[in-house]
């Protein structure tokens, strides 16, 4: 069953807030900007992670130095998974944060 528009927006809002919370609590030197549904994480070295919502597809998109990734929400598992690799958003985000900032953060709750 496809996500309703309202459910999709609630999920993306909660996910983006959880991502912000992890970075805020980490003490890592990053700039966070959330505007018009787009969350941008700017690392000290200038690299960025950009999270945006694609409402027609009901996907959360992530743009990073290593490429662009599209995530579908699995209601049964309560998690976002990449539509091409099945890698979980939490795992990919932890890996990318380590690659870009050298920090080992836990995103398992997103």
Curated annotation (Swiss-Prot):
Taxonomy, superkingdom: Bacteria
UniProt GO molecular function: ferric iron binding; ferrous iron binding
Keywords: Iron, Metal-binding
Pfam families, A to Z: Frataxin_Cyay
UniProt-listed SUPFAM superfamilies: Frataxin/Nqo15-like
Metal-binding recorded as keyword: yes
Protein name (database record): Iron-sulfur cluster assembly protein CyaY
Organism encoding this protein: Pseudomonas syringae pv. tomato (strain ATCC BAA-871 / DC3000)
Gene: cyaY
């Amino acid at each position: 069953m496809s996500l309703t528009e309202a459910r999709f927006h609630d999920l993306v809002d909660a996910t983006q807030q959880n991502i912000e919370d992890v970075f805020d609590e980490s003490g890592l030197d990053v700039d966070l900007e959330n505007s018009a549904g787009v969350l941008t994480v700017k690392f000290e070295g200038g690299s960025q992670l950009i999270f945006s919502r694609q409402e027609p597809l009901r996907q959360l998109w992530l743009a990073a130095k290593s490429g662009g990734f599209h995530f579908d929400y699995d209601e049964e598992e309560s998690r976002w998974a990449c539509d091409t690799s099945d890698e979980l958003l939490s795992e990919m985000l932890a890996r990318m944060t380590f690659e870009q900032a050298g920090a080992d953060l836990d995103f398992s709750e997103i």
